[in-house]
């Protein structure tokens, strides 16, 4: 918003702010707040240009209110009302007050009575005004979806006037305001995205029970003199040489007094003075256009990785008789954006004359629209950590601060309207969303004007989608275009995210052909299927659907029985996938996982196989588009992965989850989007080097190696002297020939080194001699079935390997800590340590999130070493010392200290029971006090066992410290064996009193240097104790 000033946010109450922060993180345990009121009314200053956000409200159902006019009268009793933050839906406010259990867990949200949200809810607050000589306004948008507005007992706007989530309102309440305490109240009406031009959740997640009714943006209390200054902005035009920009400053001045006035509007733009005097009749409004300002050698704004992110300031004051009346401040960037159609009809974006491949994801806010600036910044930092450059916002257009963050980070944004509800109800046939009535047209036009005004000066914004699945009809489109013209929104306008054209703007240059559910990696490379989602043109939203989170997150979001159903019966309805029947289960994904990787033995096995599947699929999706970007015909020009993140704890459409944890999909995307990258083509076996940096590179060496699963090398090739251009250019290193004697499942490793021999890219694939074959003729809009499946089940028999690990941490002055982890394959033989994942954890074994790794999910052959770094907020350790939990497909799990003191040979290493091999037992989490993601509950049978794979640097005697619980009154003995030989028999594990009471037992064993297997076997019909972990 061009006139929005930077400000310090004013807390509602310390208690409620803390509760909100917890709620945004998915924790909804907050102090009860019934009977509480806002402690002190907001003091509203009288200075010209003062814009103070209302810090919070108390809310209550209108069913509890008998007299509407009384609510906004000072002194109205609000005992029993709920204090909420400045931007809060009704349900979010009730969560903030601890009224309902964590909605991110299990089916808790399903149990919330929805009837209470079928009536309006009141939002009430008090303002303290000491000086009424200034005029007073309420300036706001973000009401879902309509409201009556009351001030001091007077209705100043009706729900027919305040209608639409994006419409902006500037209510002059000067006549209602008096000295002292004043009261403002919004009567917010129920939201229905199918009937209202607001926000809905389509098939992304379960719909909140209140459908997000509430106020989700700031309401500003503005003060000014007779003349109000609005809509200050800069139209900038950058020349092709990037060495000069012309700046045109415009602003609206409005005389709200009953007398004619003369006002002088003066200030600076990019440090250069400007001034103009204007005469205004009573109640007259004029647009002031200042003379052109030239800017030589401007600091041009660039996307991240292409240059800097400089922004200039605009600072204006409107004065009457030499006295300031109103003021406006804003920032803007100097840059040029184009989005033209190439010869194949695809949409090609360029910034400052440089074409670029759009690589992004579909962004979503929190399911309850709870704004958290830190969380939003974390998400956009993940975008850069992934190597992406763009986010698409389909509806749910975030507040001003979001775009400020994107501007500062250099993340491109593609906002636009959403599909599948009222926004497209006039044009989408039988799909959801009611057809428009006459009153919808001005609301849509006003929404477009408001958002265009707000977004136009943000250099991160590169276009606006006026349609998603469907383009608007002529009347709707003309309204949008007229609004954009009036708002001086000069960026590209995209008629639809699909291939549907609009009557005026014409072709979209984009496609939305799916898939949205499982397809194999080879799918993405096929350009011959013109109605499918392969890597050609601009793919505005697509993915292989399911993205299973890590076990850490799954334990936080689903009950034990739900997790059991998830892996045993993927065809069952999954509440945490989607409300849609099409995407309500995991059947397509589960079937493919079993056919390609083999049947899952247990939950852990299902989850780890899911990570491999997601990694290979997401990697292929991005790699195929990067490879095809420079094709001479029908190139790929953009890919928006569906989606970047999920609004809640979800099983699909996410590169990272609601808790910011990173799964296989994340690391597959990160690998594919390395700045300088070597990759394999699933369709034609070519090995290609992609350079996404701004500089050409030469002197590269590409090495190819193929291995059977027993470690035998079957093919090797080295290509030297490779050169590759900049900004998405590619060079082919080799095409892998047919190789005889490969195992059905085999491994491939590609390494790219620079002219100094330094490794700059490593990429490991697990492949099959049996191909995935697609049945294109059986395609549906959301997936394409397979007639044959690759066989990757050989990975289940990959022999054990060993990883040695050391870690160290350094806390920085900026409040972050960097943990460095060095991994080495210490096994003898030929087997790699495959898919080794590292996590920074706190003293309780919980992941420290968010975290930015330079690389992860790595594979190392014997003797190979890699060093990883992880950066995170020191405060997220919550006072504990960091450790690193390291788990690999064939290495077991270990936890090494990383507390900054430096690891030594005697440092203990933890091995979690839930990551071990379990026979006749189950991983559970129903008793508190465990570490990691759970514990093992032995079946009540002799012979049930847990077997850990451990690594030690040298042969000798070691203490195995077993952390266990036994809630019975009898001992549950275990036999311990090492590498198949009994080491300790009948070790007693006595009662601990209760199951949540944990203690330790030490068992001394003799281990060989390198990899060992330690098995603990129950010797009685009672089975063993619950085992949390062993520490070696």
Swiss-Prot record:
GO CC annotation, single: extracellular region
UniProt main location, coarse: secreted
Domain (CBM6): residue spans on this chain: 909-1032
BP terms from Gene Ontology: chitin catabolic process; polysaccharide catabolic process
GO molecular function: carbohydrate binding; exo-1,4-beta-D-glucosaminidase activity; hydrolase activity, hydrolyzing O-glycosyl compounds
Gene3D superfamilies recorded: Galactose-binding domain-like, Glycosidases, Immunoglobulins
Temperature-related activity annotation: Optimum temperature is 60 degrees Celsius. Stable below 50 degrees Celsius, inactive above 60 degrees Celsius.
Keyword presence, Nucleotidyltransferase: no
Cystine connections: none
pH-activity dependence text: Optimum pH is 5.5 with chitotriitol as substrate, and 5.3 with (GlcN)2 as substrate. Activity is lost below pH 3.5 and above pH 8.0.
Enzyme Commission code(s) on record: 3.2.1.165
Record's keyword terms, sorted: Carbohydrate metabolism, Chitin degradation, Glycosidase, Hydrolase, Polysaccharide degradation, Secreted, Signal
Catalytic activity: Hydrolysis of chitosan or chitosan oligosaccharides to remove successive D-glucosamine residues from the non-reducing termini
Region feature (Disordered): 883-908
Role summary: Hydrolyzes chitosan and chitooligosaccharides with retention of anomeric configuration. Has maximum activity on chitotetraose, chitopentaose and their corresponding alcohols, with a slight decrease in the rate of hydrolysis on longer chains. Has no activity against beta-D-glucopyranoside, beta-D-xylopyranoside, beta-D-mannoside, beta-D-glucuronide, beta-D-galactoside, beta-D-N-acetylgalactosamide, beta-D-N-acetylglucosaminide and alpha-D-N-acetylglucosaminide.
The family this protein is said to belong to: Belongs to the glycosyl hydrolase 2 family.
Name recorded for this polypeptide: Exo-beta-D-glucosaminidase
The gene coding this protein: csxA
């Amino acid at each position: 918003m061009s006139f929005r000033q930077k400000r310090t946010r004013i807390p509602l109450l310390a208690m409620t702010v803390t509760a909100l922060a917890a709620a945004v993180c998915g924790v909804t345990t907050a102090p009860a707040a019934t009977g509480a009121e806002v402690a002190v009314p907001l003091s509203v200053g009288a200075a010209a240009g003062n814009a103070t956000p209302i810090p919070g409200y108390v809310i209550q159902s209108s069913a509890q209110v008998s007299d509407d006019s009384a609510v906004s009268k000072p002194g109205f009793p609000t005992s029993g009302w709920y204090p909420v933050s400045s931007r809060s839906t009704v349900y979010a406010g009730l969560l903030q007050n601890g009224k309902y259990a964590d909605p991110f867990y299990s089916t808790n949200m399903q149990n919330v009575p929805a009837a209470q949200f079928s009536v309006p809810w009141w939002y009430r607050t008090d303002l303290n005004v000491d000086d009424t000589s200034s005029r007073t306004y309420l300036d706001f948008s973000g009401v879902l979806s309509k409201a009556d507005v009351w001030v001091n007992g007077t209705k100043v706007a009706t729900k027919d006037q305040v209608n639409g989530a994006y419409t902006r309102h500037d209510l002059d309440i000067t006549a209602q305001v008096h000295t002292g305490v004043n009261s403002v109240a919004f009567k917010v009406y129920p939201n229905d995205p199918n009937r209202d031009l607001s926000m809905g959740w389509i098939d992304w997640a379960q719909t909140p029970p209140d459908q997000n009714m509430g106020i989700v943006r700031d309401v500003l209390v503005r003060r000014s003199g007779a003349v109000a200054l609005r809509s200050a902005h800069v139209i900038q035009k950058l020349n092709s040489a990037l060495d000069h920009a012309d700046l045109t400053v415009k602003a609206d001045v409005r005389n709200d007094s009953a007398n004619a006035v003369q006002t002088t509007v003066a200030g600076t733009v990019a440090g250069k003075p400007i001034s103009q005097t204007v005469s205004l009749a009573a109640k007259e409004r004029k647009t002031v256009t200042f003379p052109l300002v030239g800017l030589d050698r401007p600091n041009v704004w660039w996307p991240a990785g292409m240059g800097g992110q400089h922004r200039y300031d605009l600072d204006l004051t409107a004065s009457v008789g030499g006295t300031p009346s109103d003021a406006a401040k804003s920032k803007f960037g100097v840059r040029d954006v184009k989005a033209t159609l190439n010869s194949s009809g695809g949409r090609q974006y360029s910034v400052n004359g440089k074409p670029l491949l759009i690589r992004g994801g579909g962004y979503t806010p929190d399911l309850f629209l709870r704004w958290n600036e830190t969380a939003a910044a974390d998400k956009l930092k993940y975008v850069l950590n992934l190597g992406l450059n763009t986010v698409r916002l389909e509806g749910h257009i975030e507040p001003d601060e979001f775009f400020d963050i994107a501007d500062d980070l250099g993340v491109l944004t593609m906002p636009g309207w959403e599909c599948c509800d009222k926004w497209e109800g006039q044009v989408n046939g039988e799909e959801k969303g009611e057809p428009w009535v006459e009153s919808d047209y001005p609301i849509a036009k006003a929404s477009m004007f408001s958002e265009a005004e707000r977004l136009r000066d943000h250099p991160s914004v590169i276009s606006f989608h006026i349609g998603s699945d469907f383009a608007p009809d002529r009347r709707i489109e003309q309204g949008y275009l007229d609004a954009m013209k009036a708002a001086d929104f000069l960026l590209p306008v995209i008629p639809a995210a699909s291939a549907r054209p609009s009557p005026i703007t014409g072709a979209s240059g984009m496609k939305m052909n799916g898939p949205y559910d499982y397809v194999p990696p080879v799918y993405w490379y096929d350009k011959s299927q013109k109605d499918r989602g392969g890597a050609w043109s601009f793919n505005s939203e697509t993915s292989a659907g399911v993205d299973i989170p890590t076990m850490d997150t799954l334990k936080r979001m689903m009950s034990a029985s739900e997790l059991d159903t998830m892996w045993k019966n993927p065809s069952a309805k999954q509440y945490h996938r989607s409300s849609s029947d099409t995407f309500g289960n995991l059947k397509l994904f589960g079937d493919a996982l079993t056919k390609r990787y083999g049947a899952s033995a247990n939950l852990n096995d299902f989850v780890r196989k899911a990570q491999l599947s997601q990694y290979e699929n997401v990697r292929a999706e991005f790699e195929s588009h990067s490879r095809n970007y420079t094709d001479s015909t029908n190139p790929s020009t953009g890919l928006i992965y569906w989606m970047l993140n999920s609004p809640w704890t979800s099983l699909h459409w996410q590169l990272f989850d609601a808790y910011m944890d990173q799964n296989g999909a994340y690391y597959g995307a990160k690998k594919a989007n390395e700045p300088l990258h070597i990759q394999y083509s699933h369709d034609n076996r070519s090995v290609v080097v992609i350079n996404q940096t701004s500089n050409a590179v030469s002197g590269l060496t590409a090495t190819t190696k193929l291995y059977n699963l027993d470690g035998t090398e079957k093919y090797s090739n080295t290509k030297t002297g490779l050169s590759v251009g900049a900004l998405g250019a590619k060079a082919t290193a080799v095409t892998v020939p047919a190789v005889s004697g490969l195992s059905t499942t085999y491994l491939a490793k590609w390494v790219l080194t620079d002219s100094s021999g330094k490794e700059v890219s490593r990429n490991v694939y697990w492949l099959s001699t049996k191909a995935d074959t697609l049945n294109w003729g059986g395609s549906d809009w959301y997936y394409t079935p397979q007639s044959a499946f690759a066989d990757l089940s050989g990975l289940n028999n990959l022999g054990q390997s060993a990883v040695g690990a050391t870690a160290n941490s350094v806390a920085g002055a900026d409040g972050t800590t960097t943990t460095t982890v060095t991994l080495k394959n210490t096994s003898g033989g030929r087997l790699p340590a495959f898919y080794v994942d590292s996590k920074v954890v706190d003293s309780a074994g919980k992941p420290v999130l968010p975290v930015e790794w330079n690389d992860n999910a790595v594979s190392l052959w014997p003797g190979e070493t890699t060093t990883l770094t992880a950066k995170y907020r020191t405060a997220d350790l919550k006072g504990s010392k960091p450790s690193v939990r390291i788990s690999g497909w064939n290495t077991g799990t270990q936890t090494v200290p990383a507390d900054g003191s430096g690891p030594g040979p005697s440092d203990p290493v933890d091995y979690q029971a839930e990551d071990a091999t379990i026979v006749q037992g189950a991983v559970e989490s129903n008793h508190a006090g465990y570490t990691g993601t759970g514990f093992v509950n032995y079946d009540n049978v002799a012979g049930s066992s847990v077997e850990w794979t451990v690594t030690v640097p040298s042969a000798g005697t070691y203490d195995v410290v077993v952390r266990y619980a036994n809630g019975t009154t009898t001992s549950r003995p275990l036999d311990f064996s090492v590498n198949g030989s009994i080491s300790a028999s009948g070790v007693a594990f006595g009662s601990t009193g209760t199951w949540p009471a944990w203690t330790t037992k030490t068992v001394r064993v003799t281990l060989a240097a390198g990899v060992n297997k330690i098995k603990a076997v129950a010797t009685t019909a009672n089975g063993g104790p619950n085992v949390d972990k062993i520490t070696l």
